[in-house]
Regions:
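Gly/Ser/Thr-enriched, mixed-charge loops and adjacent short helices
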Residues: 1-77
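Short acidic (Asp/Glu) and glycine-rich catalytic loops that position anionic groups and cofactors
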Residues: 51, 89-95, 138-142, 169-174
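Short, high-confidence coil segments that cap the C-terminus of an alpha-helix
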Residues: 79-81, 166-167
């Protein structure tokens, strides 16, 4: 079950990718990612501090997860972590914060991944954003010669455009 899923998830990372030396807090929102999230990060070598990992069927997203970012911000400071990752209950959204507990905007996450993947020759085609993506993000991609296409708002539409254009990176701010 879970071990097989971790192996599948790890295939999305470059060979020999690791998080050794990083302290990461992950808030799993008492939801779907409560086992796989921490295990994936640990399997990549990170020192993991997991919160929101006690689902009881009623407490999903309750005062935790990506809809309650203050929890991850304070946990990052408490554990002196390098980064905080906060999932929503079904683990399809993420909010991140830096080592100071400052929230990292979704467009910033996409931009950082795009540049990193471009430099490592991992980016395929370009980026899919949405109609709500910041215009500054579009300008940033143009400046860095990365193709940028907007989709309607919603992960379904982002995924459709990614598949249609054979792109391997896309997302929206939420």
């Amino acid at each position: 079950g879970n071990e097989e899923y971790i192996k599948i998830l790890k295939k999305n990372f470059p060979k020999n990718f690791n998080l050794e030396g990083l302290k990461i807090v992950i808030d799993c929102a008492n939801g779907a990612g409560y086992k796989a999230g921490p295990k994936l990060l640990e399997s990549l070598g990170a020192k993991v501090f997991a919160i929101g990992i006690k689902p009881n069927g009623l407490n999903i997203n309750k005062n935790c997860g990506s809809t309650f970012p203050n929890k991850i911000k304070s946990a990052v400071k408490k554990y002196n972590a390098h980064i905080g990752i906060s999932l929503d209950g079904d683990a399809d959204r993420v909010i991140m914060c830096d080592e100071r507990g400052s929230i990292i905007d979704g467009d910033q996450i996409i931009a950082a991944l795009a540049i990193r993947w471009k430099n490592k020759k991992m980016l395929r085609g370009g980026i899919i954003g949405t109609l709500m993506s910041n215009y500054g993000l579009e300008k940033f991609f143009k400046l860095n010669q990365i193709k940028f296409i907007r989709a309607n708002v919603g992960d379904r539409y982002v995924k459709e455009k990614m598949q249609k254009n054979n792109f391997n990176l896309g997302g929206e701010q939420s």
